[in-house]
Amino acid sequence: MGKNVVILGTQWGDEGKGKIVDLLTDQASLVARFQGGHNAGHTLVIDGKKTVLHLIPSGILREDVQCLIGNGVVLSLEALLKEIGGLEDQGVPVRDRLRLSASCPLILPVHVALDQAREAARGNKKIGTTGRGIGPAYEDKVARRGLRLGDVYQRELFAAKLGEVMDYHNFVLRSYYNAEPVDFQKTLDDTLQLGEDVRSMVTDVTAVLHGARERGENIMFEGAQGTLLDIDHGTYPYVTSSNTTAGGTATGTGFGPLYLDYVLGITKAYTTRVGSGPFPTELFDENGRYLAEKGHEFGSTTGRARRCGWFDAVALKRSIQINSITGLCLTKLDVLDGLEEINICVGYQDAAGNSLECAWDADSYEEVKPVYESLPGWSESTLGVKSEDDLPPNAKAYLKRIEAITGAPIDIISTGPDRVETIIKRHPFS
């Protein structure tokens, strides 16, 4: 009897999901992406060699693991083929092991132009998008005018649909943003050619997943971004355009929620955020700089410096509820080595000192003041530790306190970037 496991972020993304997916696929037959696009950046370090993936599931570096991109993912064919080429240059047989849903919405050049024009027009109120067309592509999907991967193989119909979509968006670019329109013929020719380049990988991903389930194979679902960036449950409007939560697994692949056996929530030992938006525990002092420098907190997709802050247990508790999380994986514990004192946010207050529940709209969240509980740090190194018994006593106490506050067990502890630098207390597939 196989097990079906979801791996997702519980914070604002960048929690270290890529490493954990790569690590746990030693017991998986399939890995599926279910939302997002090439705005995600998953960094893998194997035997000291770093690989950054944006679209292709992190299981691609495991031999004999089938990788799937589900219908919930918005697809830039150009970005996908660039990523495939980079992996093939390393000797990874991507085309044999990657399959794409024919229902994936396409990201077109006009979506990228719109995304960038909008961010420029917002001035100092930027949302902080990656400018890669993700949001506009999802908008077209919801507006029912979006083009999907399977459409590319019906040339005349595709050309007609593309013309309508581009007329609409080019009008907005010219008339509202005073920006250059995107060329229709070039977009058509390029997209048709790119579609042919991936044709052998296009399939019914939902059918593939259910076939594997019926055969009793282990399946992993890989989330992108994090719960606090969810379009419905995140710090709106400073969020992404998809459902990053466990519910997105079902809608983004066609794999029903009752088939899921375990949800693993990835959380850093502290908190980070890229781009704009509220961040109650953000640090602007030496501790913040220490976390940023020691944690190498720069985005793998954009290269932008990440904002750093103390661990937010209030936000994590909400993520646990939203995702029905079975167990936690705490990453980057080693980054806290050397701090004399470590804070955990255990509550929120308003300006008058009144206790608050989670405030998920950005305006309310901006007014939140964190309530901290302080714990002693540790001077010993946790880097590369592979047994919980070998952790410093204060590091163990920190982990136990997080478990007590959130009510969720920490099943996995990451103590370094390499896949072997990990403590597994309970394997999700066991």
UniProtKB/Swiss-Prot annotation:
Keywords annotated in UniProt: Cytoplasm, GTP-binding, Ligase, Magnesium, Metal-binding, Nucleotide-binding, Purine biosynthesis
Active site positions, chain numbering: D14 (proton acceptor), H42 (proton donor)
Family annotation (SMART domains): Adenylsucc_synt
Binding site for IMP: D14, E15, G16, K17, N39, A40, G41, H42, T130, R144, Q225, T240, R304
Keyword Thylakoid: no
Catalytic activity: IMP + L-aspartate + GTP = N(6)-(1,2-dicarboxyethyl)-AMP + GDP + phosphate + 2 H(+)
Example GO molecular function: adenylosuccinate synthase activity
Main location: cytoplasm
Entry's Gene Ontology BP terms: 'de novo' AMP biosynthetic process; IMP metabolic process
Annotated InterPro entries: Adenylosuccin_syn_GTP-bd, Adenylosuccin_syn_Lys_AS, Adenylosuccinate_synth_dom1, Adenylosuccinate_synth_dom2, Adenylosuccinate_synth_dom3, Adenylosuccinate_synthetase, P-loop_NTPase
Complexes and interactors: Homodimer.
Family to which the UniProt record says this protein belongs: Belongs to the adenylosuccinate synthetase family.
Protein name per its UniProtKB record: Adenylosuccinate synthetase
Organism encoding this protein: Alcanivorax borkumensis (strain ATCC 700651 / DSM 11573 / NCIMB 13689 / SK2)
Gene name, Swiss-Prot/TrEMBL: purA
